[in-house]
Design a protein with these regions (language model features):
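Short, charged low-complexity linear motifs
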Residues: 49-52, 74, 134-137
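Short, low-complexity N-terminal intrinsically disordered segments enriched in polar/charged residues
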Residues: 2-56, 60, 166
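A generic signature of intrinsically disordered, low-complexity regions enriched in glycine/proline
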Residues: 6, 71-73, 158
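A beta-strand edge to alpha-helix "cap/lid" segment located at domain peripheries
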Residues: 8-19, 24-26, 30, 86-166
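A solvent-exposed, acidic/Ser-Thr-rich amphipathic alpha-helical stretch
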Residues: 34, 53, 60-105, 110
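Short, mixed-charge, low-aromatic patches
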Residues: 40-49, 72-76, 92-96, 116-118
Length: 166
């Protein structure tokens, strides 16, 4: 699968703008603002399928962490390194299509950014929808690049949809 087509979701560049406007009312120090901007740019690039920008914003030693049902082909715990992450993303997007993405809150403190919201997805294997579920993200930034993408979600409902048990 071509890298540019790996992620076809509703997480478009507007995601970054939405979060930025929510956080705009808060005062941030320069490091926090830079970290926030980096994570929002990364999310926007991911949602828009802009692999060049994603690659530029990823540290070579970036870790993507996602726990859950190990029978799901994209759940591996820690995925380490840019190359491994680019191999993982097409597996994820070919199995789960995001159908809804709403951000609730986001904040940044130093090198850490947290994002909280609600999403829904459809498992391509079964066609079953997860319905709405919550997510949280903890990301870390170093020297203008994302070094940690720690994803939290309702992995039970995702597993149920994937295995046709909804």
């Amino acid at each position: 699968m071509h890298r540019r087509t790996f992620i076809k979701t509703s997480i478009a560049a507007a995601l970054a703008a939405t979060l930025a406007s929510k956080l705009g009312a808060q005062e941030m120090d320069a490091e926090s603002q830079a970290s926030f901007d980096t994570v929002m740019a990364f999310m926007g690039a991911m949602g828009g399928g802009d692999m060049d920008t994603m690659s530029r914003l990823m540290a070579d030693d970036m870790v993507w962490h996602n726990e859950g049902d190990k029978t799901l082909p994209w759940i591996h715990g820690d995925i380490k390194g840019k190359a491994a992450i680019f191999e993982f993303l097409p597996v994820f997007s070919s199995n789960l299509q995001t159908t809804k993405w709403e951000n609730g809150d986001a904040f940044a403190s130093g090198d850490t950014v947290a994002v909280f919201g609600t999403m829904a997805a459809t498992a391509t294997k079964t066609g079953q929808s997860t319905g709405d579920f919550t997510f949280a993200l903890r990301a870390k930034v170093r020297d203008g690049q994302v070094v940690l993408w720690h994803w939290f979600e309702d992995s039970f409902v995702v597993s149920q949809a994937y295995h046709g048990k909804m």
